[in-house]
């Protein structure tokens, strides 16, 4: 199983059923950037965890639980396969607990995930982001991503940020 390397503040582990309460909290949290978004339920969190188990089995990656080195739950971050206009892409995605936002955790976790993707042969990485979600656009830019196009997805526009990746050995 692929797992990103720990960072100076964060660790990654597989998501499991025992994470249901934490995942419900992060997925159902009010998002001031998207106040009209339907808030997810505990049942949604169950399906989310089940989806990660399928991702781990099918792709050897998924969204991983992100914690501080002291074990405090930060959220999730990882890789998923996404169909964008009929083409499969690897996407970096994340959710951060409201009280943990604006502390650089999303960028730190997503950077480790980006580097893990590159080390495991992912050649192109995307992030699908709603136009009004400027904080996530900032994270994508911090990862070296650029706006590639806008697509219609799940009832609204989505910005497709992306970048080419290279293994570290190829950069030398």
Each PLM stretch: what is its role?
Residues 1-38, 46, 50, 54, ...:
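Acyl-donor (CoA/ACP) binding surface of acyl/acetyltransferases
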Residues 41:
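Acidic-and-aromatic substrate-binding clefts and catalytic sites of carbohydrate-active enzymes
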Residues 60:
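Short, small/polar residue-rich loop motifs at catalytic or cofactor-binding pockets
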Residues 57:
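Extracellular/periplasmic catalytic domains that process cell-envelope and extracellular macromolecules
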């Amino acid at each position: 199983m692929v797992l990103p390397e720990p960072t100076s503040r964060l660790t990654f582990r597989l998501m499991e059923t025992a994470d249901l309460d934490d995942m419900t909290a992060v997925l159902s949290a009010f998002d001031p950037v998207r106040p009209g978004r339907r808030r997810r339920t505990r049942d949604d969190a169950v399906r989310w965890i089940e989806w990660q188990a399928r991702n781990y089995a099918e792709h050897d990656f998924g969204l991983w639980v992100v914690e501080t080195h002291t074990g405090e739950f930060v959220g999730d971050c990882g890789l998923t396969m996404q169909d964008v206009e009929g083409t499969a892409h690897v996407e970096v995605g994340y959710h951060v607990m409201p009280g943990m936002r604006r502390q650089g955790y999303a960028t730190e976790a997503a950077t480790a995930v980006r580097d893990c993707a590159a080390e495991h042969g992912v050649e192109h990485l995307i992030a699908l982001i709603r136009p009004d979600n400027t904080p996530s656009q900032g994270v994508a830019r911090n990862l070296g991503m650029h706006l590639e196009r806008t697509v219609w997805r799940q009832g609204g526009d989505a910005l497709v940020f992306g970048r080419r990746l290279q293994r570290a050995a190829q950069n030398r």
